[in-house]
Amino acid sequence: MHAPPTPPTAPRTRLRTRALGFAALAVAMLMSVPTAQTAFGEEAAAVPGGGDLGPNVHVFDPSTPDIQGKVDEIFKKQESAQFGLDRHALMFKPGTYDNINAQIGFYTQIAGLGLNPNDTTFNGDVTVDAGWFDGNATQNFWRSAENLTLNPVSGTNRWAVSQAAPFRRMHVKGGLNLAPDGYGWASGGYIADSKIDGEVGPYSQQQWYTRDSSVGGWVNGVWNMTFSGVEGAPANSFPEPPYTTLDTTPISREKPFLYLDGADYKVFVPEKRENARGVSWADGTPAGESIPLDQFYVVKEGADAATINAAVEQGLHLLFTPGVYHIDETININRADTVALGLGLATIIPDNGVTAIKVGDVDGVKLAGLLVDAGPVNSETLIEVGPENASADHSANPTSLQDVFVRIGGAGPGKATTSIVVNSDDVIIDHTWVWRADHGEGWG
């Protein structure tokens, strides 16, 4: 049997911080809108909150005709589009969906729109396999599944992914297979806040991290299987078998997510948890805050950084709809408790060497669901959290980065000196992949 390949080497990442939490529109409207004061005391049109979710968010309910056909159409486009420009979010309203096999390709997010994963049930599967790459799953990147309950047709759901492909807030009423058909190589992976009633079978997976979840058993390990706060996890036994197990997760927070409250879209922002074990939703409604969509600037392709920054300064949160966003100035988030949530692997590219995102040394900013892709002009940094020498105590309400990914090259020439700099204290980094391309275009 061949040994699995070594995973791609990540770019240099400088994390300057005293304490890290555990873990790894387009144009402002000019008519009939409120006004705001500019820095020079002038009246400026305010950026409106709310609105529709744009063309790349596909919303389904149980009565939608030919759901399988639409899902298959998107998968056909995205199955092998590793460095493509399309982005998609498949959103399912609460209810029961029969005979669904949602195959998930690159830059595709599938999610339920309930407050609890059990609100949206598939009598079927959410599948990732590796047929496009001859059974090798080591390049199954950049996709996600969230907030659904699955009754797999065969009794076991297949989620054969590698990096940057989270499985969050999922309830699988059966088993979960993390390997591709044929047990080819795979280099995952991440599960959080999920309940797997049956066994999880990594099989050919090189490594995996599972956090604050519940499993009915764990079959094997190859290099390292890591668990924190997981009910049913195997006992700590590294290196043979290669299980690293913590009974609880010292500090964690679940990722914000979009949901429907009746007919109204809201974003739920979970509370910080201490010494967590098991899922956050076991008793029904999780602890946290619901924010109406009209308190968000719904960012769509074509939006510029100036408008995004104006929205934040005005007091709005940010919801990036699926798309690719080219910016010519830094997105600055200096207001405490701001949520910046991306759908469908929303991608930010700094075109002229600026830092893509800077977060101030403030409490409780939530960055989630974003891919920052280095541009052709070198950026000294791509993401910064807090200025140099930041020293404020944020332990009661830390900033968090969740499913925030960085890429340098692959989709084209990309240059950056340092990917992520964390200067603020107490920051929670919950699932990231910081990748300097070893294939594609513009790498090396």
Regions found by a protein language model. Name each.
Residues 12, 16-21, 187:
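Generic alpha-helix initiation/capping and coil-helix boundary signal
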Residues 1-16:
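N-terminal secretory signal peptides that target proteins for export/translocation
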Residues 21-34:
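Bacterial N-terminal signal peptides
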Residues 6, 22, 41:
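Alpha-helical and His/Cys-centered functional microenvironments
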Residues 42-444:
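Extracellular/periplasmic carbohydrate-active domains that bind, remodel
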Residues 6, 30, 36, 70, ...:
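Compositionally biased, intrinsically disordered low-complexity segments
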Residues 31-46:
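C-terminal region of N-terminal signal peptides and the immediate post-cleavage residues
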